[in-house]
Structure formats: C-alpha cells, structure tokens
Amino acid sequence: MAENNENISKNVDVRPKTSRSRSADRKDGYVWSGKKLSWSKKSESYSDAETVNGIEKTEVSLRNQERKHSCSSIELDLDHSCGHRFLGRSLKQKLQDAVGQCFPIKNCSSRHSSGLPSKRKIHISELMLDKCPFPPRSDLAFRWHFIKRHTAPINSKSDEWVSTDLSQAELKDGQLKRRNMEESINCFSHTNVQPCVITTDNALCREGPITGSVMNLVSNNSIEDSDMDSDDEILTLCTSSRKRNKPKWELDDEILQLETPPKYHTQIDYVHCLVPDLLQINNNPCYWGVMDKYAAEALLEGKPEGTFLLRDSAQEDYLFSVSFRRYSRSLHARIEQWNHNFSFDAHDPCVFHSPDITGLLEHYKDPSACMFFEPLLSTPLIRTFPFSLQHICRTVICNCTTYDGIDALPIPSSMKLYLKEYHYKSKVRVLRIDAPEQQC
C-alpha cells in the first residue's frame, strides 16, 4: 500500500507546465527548507489552483468578447453612418475616417504633391521670350526669372553688347578676326553661316569688329534634319579642321599676333651731366665713398637715432645712398634724380627735392621738417680715413669742366672714363617712330 501511495503522489505532480498555476510554479521553483506537504494539503492546493485558473480564463474570455463587441459596434456605426462608402476598405482606413470625423485631418497627399519640385525643364525658346510664359508664383516661373536675371540678353540691340567708341586699331583687329573666322567656316559647304552684325548709335559697322569676338552660327540643315520641335533653336559652334590639326604652339602664336597691339619704335635722347657738387661731397666728413649696406649697418650699430652716413650706391642706376639710424634700427634710402633735381622720391612732387646733394642733406637735418617715413639726417658719422689723391684730383677736375668737355682734354681715354664715372643722364626727348602698317 505504501508503494501505491508513493506512485499516486508521483503521478499527481507529473503534469505539463502550461496547466500549472503560478503558485505551483513558485513552489516548484523555490527551495523549501521545511518538511514536505501531505497528500491532503497538496490536493487542496491543486483544487485552489484549478479554481483560480478557471476564474482567470472566464475573465479573459469576457474581455475578448467585450473587445470584439466594441470593434463590431464601431464597424456597425461606421457602416450605418457612412453607408456603403467604406465597403472594401481596411480597418486602418476606416479608423482614420472615423477619427477624421471628430478631429478633421488635412489631406497630406495633395499638399505634398503640390510642394514637390516639377521635373519639367525650361526650354531655350521660352527663355528667349520677354515675358514669363509660366503661371505666377510657380516653381517654373521662379526658375525662369532667376535664369533671366543671371544671364546676358541674347539681343544685338541691347546696350550692353554695343561698343560706342571704336578706334581704328580695334576696327582693323575686328576685320582680321572676321576674315579668319570666315576662312575657317568656308570648309563647311553644307552649312549656311549668318554672322551677327552689331550696330552702334553713330554708324553701321558692317565690316567692323564683333564685340567680345562673339558670333551666332545657325545651321539650317541641322534644324531640318533634327527630330526636335520647331520652337527649338540650335546654337552650333563651327571650328575649322585646318586649325584643329595645327600644333598648339602655332595656334598660340596666331592668337598672340591678333591680341598684341601695333608696335612702335621709340627713340629716347639723353643728356649726360656730371654731379654738380662732387667737390663739396668729397669734402663732407659724412661721405664714406664706396660701401655696401652691410658695412654701413655695422658702422651704425648701437648709434643714436638720427646718425647717418653718405655712401656710393651699390646699384648702377643710382649714384648715392644714405644709411641712417631711426626707429632703433638701421635703414637705407637711395637718392634719385629727375629733371636735374635730387630727392628721395623723384616720382612724388610733394617730396622735397634739391638741385644738389649737399642741399638735400641739409634739409633733412631738422627733425621738424622730416616726416615719419622720411630719413632723419641730424648727426653725421665722421669718416675715419682720407681719400686717395687720384680721387681728390678727379673731383677737382670735374668741378672745373663738363661731361662733354672731358672729351676735349689731352688725356688718355682710360682717364677720360675715370673722370666720367660720377655722372647722371637726364631724359631730353622721346621720339616715337610708327611702324609701317601691315596690309591685310
């Protein structure tokens, strides 16, 4: 009997997990430390679990019935209110229609469809019109006005494409360009070319240049052979096969010859003059003779502001330069000559200029007369060595003669060149000789 009772108790617990209640699962999953329950207690717990499961099943079935009843009532109400209009629609569409009756929903499809950009392209014939062919405030109208605003008008009568003042040189260049273009176009015998004629207010330039080298080439045969509409206009650019086969450097030479202005031969006459106060410069203690700027900077290093020295310029186009101390550093300025006057800037008439160099140095000794960008020559740096006797003799001879008078002296030619070293040349006359015109 004991064995049978044990088998019965084992058979009671062996059942699928789906039929067990939550309390049974908890009991099976929880480790109990106490004694095992008796058969009567197990049977009571099993009966309680069955009753609980039955109650839960009935509640779930009632809820499902209520949901089905509510959905069916909504469908019936919709069918009753709207008639047969909703037949064949899905539940989602019916719910959207039902909600839309209480809360009106905008139709998004029409709004988005109108906001989408149009795929239609604006034709070139429509751009040629003076007025916009599209409805106002449309996307195509906006694009039409945008293109017309940012492109130049293709109209020969517009003032922007007309040149009012044309010189003879421009007329000749235009004739040459036009002839070259006609020669390049003659190779196409099947094409009728119509060059654009540009008129001015004064006269009709039939043989004149085309402003900007622009030509509208219209091919009549290509329009007839094409399958495009009659409103379409074709702009073709005809290029010559002869020029296409030419090397690049030959084309560049031709373009350079067309673009370069006519050349003129100029003849400039100079007069050579000796430095007027070479003897006074030689006797000035601030004159150091031949010296470069690096040696001058080494001498002026650490000297007070306004210290200066006069030296020969290292450049052949200039005779003298001054090195001075200002703004805590050593600076240099060339003495320029223009029209027998000496200054630190010969191209600026406002800058002080003097007929001799000693007068120029005397002017810049006063700090009040010196601008912030001009050299300050207040304290001369005394020379520490004497000049050679040969150099002193040259200064004395140059003080007594002129540049052309040196050639009359009975001295060797090498000595004449030595005496002419300190001289400058001044421009006297500029003669322009026109080149002979090339007949086209």
UniProtKB/Swiss-Prot annotation:
Residues 286-381 form the SH2 domain. One of its GO terms (molecular function) is 1-phosphatidylinositol-3-kinase regulator activity. It holds the Pfam family SH2. GO terms for biological process: intracellular signal transduction; negative regulation of epidermal growth factor-activated receptor activity; phosphatidylinositol phosphate biosynthetic process; positive regulation of proteasomal ubiquitin-dependent protein catabolic process; protein ubiquitination. Residues 1-29 are annotated as: Disordered. Keywords: Growth regulation, SH2 domain, Signal transduction inhibitor, Ubl conjugation pathway. One of its GO terms (cellular component) is phosphatidylinositol 3-kinase complex. It comes from the Eukaryota. Residues 376-425 form the SOCS box domain. Pathway: Protein modification; protein ubiquitination. Residues 12-29 have a biased composition (Basic and acidic residues). Residues 1-10 have a biased composition (Polar residues). The SOCS box domain mediates the interaction with the Elongin BC complex, an adapter module in different E3 ubiquitin ligase complexes. SOCS family proteins form part of a classical negative feedback system that regulates cytokine signal transduction. Substrate-recognition component of a SCF-like ECS (Elongin BC-CUL2/5-SOCS-box protein) E3 ubiquitin-protein ligase complex which mediates the ubiquitination and subsequent proteasomal degradation of target proteins. Inhibits EGF signaling by mediating the degradation of the Tyr-phosphorylated EGF receptor/EGFR. This is Suppressor of cytokine signaling 4. It comes from Pongo abelii (Sumatran orangutan).
